[in-house]
Amino acid sequence: MPPKKKKITALIKLQINAGKATPAPPVGPALGQHGVNIMEFCKQYNAATESQTGNVVPVEITVYDDRSFTFVTKTPPAARLILKAAGVDKGSGTPHRVKVAKLTPAQVREIAQTKLPDLNANSIEAAEKIIAGTARSMGITVGE
């Protein structure tokens, strides 16, 4: 007989700094309420993201009824990549009036290529439009 499929009890989405997961909030409480071994998750997550240190890496944790878990790491949030490329700490408080930085089309393309697996875009051009829209909503202009 084939093995029984595990029943999923929870799907947890977190954004954690790469290589710096600790049992402290937000990781501890989110996993603790589902009975997951927090230290085991932290070790596995830190090992999986050690090459991306300095970025925030979203993770989707699937918890099963026997308290085991699997996780999938995503690409860093577009807003973080845009701020890093533009060299600013935060976007504009009034994005359509005050512009805080400028991105070149090459920078937008690079961010779009990084984000392409997680975006619902079929082409790099569509992904670039999504990234450019995000940048504009943060008060960052896109162009030459």
UniProtKB/Swiss-Prot annotation:
CDD domains (UniProt xref): Ribosomal_L11 (cd00349)
Gene Ontology molecular function: large ribosomal subunit rRNA binding; structural constituent of ribosome
Record bears the keyword RNA-binding: yes
Post-translational modification: One or more lysine residues are methylated.
Coiled-coil region: none
Keywords: Methylation, Ribonucleoprotein, Ribosomal protein, RNA-binding, rRNA-binding
InterPro entries membership: Ribosomal_uL11, Ribosomal_uL11_bac-typ, Ribosomal_uL11_C, Ribosomal_uL11_C_sf, Ribosomal_uL11_CS, Ribosomal_uL11_N, Ribosomal_uL11_N_sf
Any GO BP: translation
Record's subunit section: Part of the ribosomal stalk of the 50S ribosomal subunit. Interacts with L10 and the large rRNA to form the base of the stalk. L10 forms an elongated spine to which L12 dimers bind in a sequential fashion forming a multimeric L10(L12)X complex.
Known function: Forms part of the ribosomal stalk which helps the ribosome interact with GTP-bound translation factors.
Name this polypeptide is given: Large ribosomal subunit protein uL11
Species this protein is from: Parafrankia sp. (strain EAN1pec)
Gene: rplK
